[in-house]
From Swiss-Prot:
<keyword id="KW-1133">Transmembrane helix</keyword>
<dbReference type="InterPro" id="IPR003844">
    <property type="entry name" value="UPF0060"/>
</dbReference>
<protein>
    <recommendedName>
        <fullName>UPF0060 membrane protein ESA_01751</fullName>
    </recommendedName>
</protein>
<keyword id="KW-0472">Membrane</keyword>
<keyword id="KW-0812">Transmembrane</keyword>
<keyword id="KW-0997">Cell inner membrane</keyword>
<comment type="similarity">
    <text>Belongs to the UPF0060 family.</text>
</comment>
<dbReference type="Pfam" id="PF02694">
    <property type="entry name" value="UPF0060"/>
</dbReference>
<dbReference type="GO" id="GO:0005886">
    <property type="term" value="C:plasma membrane"/>
</dbReference>
<feature type="transmembrane region" description="Helical">
    <location>
        <begin position="61"/>
        <end position="81"/>
    </location>
</feature>
<feature type="transmembrane region" description="Helical">
    <location>
        <begin position="85"/>
        <end position="105"/>
    </location>
</feature>
<feature type="transmembrane region" description="Helical">
    <location>
        <begin position="29"/>
        <end position="49"/>
    </location>
</feature>
<feature type="transmembrane region" description="Helical">
    <location>
        <begin position="6"/>
        <end position="26"/>
    </location>
</feature>
<keyword id="KW-1003">Cell membrane</keyword>
Length: 108
Protein backbone atom coordinates (compact mmCIF):
# COMPACT_ATOMS: atom_id res chain seq x y z
CA UNK A 1 0.00 0.00 0.00
CA UNK A 2 2.92 2.37 0.65
CA UNK A 3 4.19 1.91 -2.92
CA UNK A 4 0.71 2.69 -4.29
CA UNK A 5 0.40 5.77 -2.09
CA UNK A 6 3.81 7.08 -3.17
CA UNK A 7 2.86 6.48 -6.79
CA UNK A 8 -0.35 8.46 -6.20
CA UNK A 9 1.65 11.37 -4.72
CA UNK A 10 4.04 11.36 -7.70
CA UNK A 11 1.04 11.31 -10.04
CA UNK A 12 -0.59 14.22 -8.22
CA UNK A 13 2.60 16.26 -8.24
CA UNK A 14 2.98 15.76 -12.00
CA UNK A 15 -0.62 16.89 -12.54
CA UNK A 16 -0.32 19.93 -10.28
CA UNK A 17 2.93 21.07 -11.92
CA UNK A 18 1.41 20.50 -15.36
CA UNK A 19 -1.49 22.79 -14.44
CA UNK A 20 0.46 25.33 -12.37
CA UNK A 21 2.92 26.27 -15.11
CA UNK A 22 0.22 27.40 -17.60
CA UNK A 23 -1.47 29.21 -14.69
CA UNK A 24 1.77 31.14 -14.15
CA UNK A 25 1.82 32.04 -17.84
CA UNK A 26 -1.84 33.09 -17.99
CA UNK A 27 -2.24 34.76 -14.59
CA UNK A 28 1.23 36.01 -13.72
CA UNK A 29 2.65 36.87 -17.13
CA UNK A 30 5.38 34.24 -17.02
CA UNK A 31 7.05 33.01 -20.20
CA UNK A 32 5.03 31.06 -22.73
CA UNK A 33 7.95 28.62 -22.73
CA UNK A 34 6.52 27.21 -19.49
CA UNK A 35 3.97 25.41 -21.65
CA UNK A 36 6.62 22.92 -22.78
CA UNK A 37 7.50 21.59 -19.31
CA UNK A 38 3.79 21.77 -18.46
CA UNK A 39 2.96 19.48 -21.39
CA UNK A 40 5.76 17.10 -20.40
CA UNK A 41 4.53 17.05 -16.82
CA UNK A 42 0.98 16.24 -17.95
CA UNK A 43 2.30 13.45 -20.18
CA UNK A 44 4.15 12.08 -17.14
CA UNK A 45 0.92 12.35 -15.15
CA UNK A 46 -1.00 10.27 -17.70
CA UNK A 47 1.76 7.67 -17.89
CA UNK A 48 1.92 7.39 -14.09
CA UNK A 49 -1.83 6.73 -14.00
CA UNK A 50 -1.26 3.66 -16.18
CA UNK A 51 1.10 2.15 -13.59
CA UNK A 52 -1.61 1.69 -10.97
CA UNK A 53 -2.76 -1.94 -10.62
CA UNK A 54 -6.54 -1.47 -10.79
CA UNK A 55 -9.34 -0.53 -13.16
CA UNK A 56 -9.08 3.09 -14.28
CA UNK A 57 -12.24 4.23 -12.48
CA UNK A 58 -10.99 2.87 -9.16
CA UNK A 59 -7.61 4.45 -9.72
CA UNK A 60 -9.20 7.84 -10.42
CA UNK A 61 -11.48 7.56 -7.38
CA UNK A 62 -8.66 6.60 -5.02
CA UNK A 63 -6.28 9.11 -6.59
CA UNK A 64 -8.68 11.91 -5.73
CA UNK A 65 -7.93 11.54 -2.03
CA UNK A 66 -4.20 11.80 -2.53
CA UNK A 67 -4.66 14.70 -4.94
CA UNK A 68 -6.51 16.65 -2.23
CA UNK A 69 -3.66 16.15 0.23
CA UNK A 70 -1.00 16.97 -2.36
CA UNK A 71 -2.84 20.13 -3.39
CA UNK A 72 -3.01 21.24 0.24
CA UNK A 73 0.72 20.62 0.67
CA UNK A 74 1.24 22.69 -2.48
CA UNK A 75 -0.99 25.41 -1.01
CA UNK A 76 1.21 25.56 2.07
CA UNK A 77 4.65 25.17 0.49
CA UNK A 78 4.29 26.99 -2.84
CA UNK A 79 1.49 29.47 -2.17
CA UNK A 80 2.53 30.08 1.43
CA UNK A 81 -1.01 29.76 2.80
CA UNK A 82 -1.40 28.36 6.29
CA UNK A 83 -3.72 25.35 6.38
CA UNK A 84 -6.85 25.52 8.48
CA UNK A 85 -8.40 22.86 10.65
CA UNK A 86 -10.96 22.38 7.86
CA UNK A 87 -8.19 21.75 5.34
CA UNK A 88 -6.66 19.07 7.57
CA UNK A 89 -10.02 17.48 8.35
CA UNK A 90 -11.02 17.39 4.68
CA UNK A 91 -7.69 15.87 3.70
CA UNK A 92 -8.04 13.22 6.41
CA UNK A 93 -11.50 12.25 5.17
CA UNK A 94 -10.29 12.13 1.56
CA UNK A 95 -7.28 9.98 2.47
CA UNK A 96 -9.47 7.60 4.48
CA UNK A 97 -11.64 7.18 1.40
CA UNK A 98 -8.56 6.49 -0.71
CA UNK A 99 -7.32 3.87 1.75
CA UNK A 100 -10.70 2.11 1.78
CA UNK A 101 -10.81 1.98 -2.02
CA UNK A 102 -7.21 0.75 -2.33
CA UNK A 103 -7.71 -1.87 0.40
CA UNK A 104 -10.55 -3.35 -1.65
CA UNK A 105 -8.67 -3.54 -4.97
CA UNK A 106 -7.94 -7.23 -4.66
CA UNK A 107 -11.39 -8.09 -3.33
CA UNK A 108 -13.65 -6.36 -5.83
Amino acid sequence: MIKTTLLFFATALAEIIGCFLPWLWLRKGASVLLLLPAALSLMLFVWLLTLHPAASGRVYAAYGGVYVMTALIWLRVVDGVRLSLYDWAGAAVALCGMLIIVAGWGRA
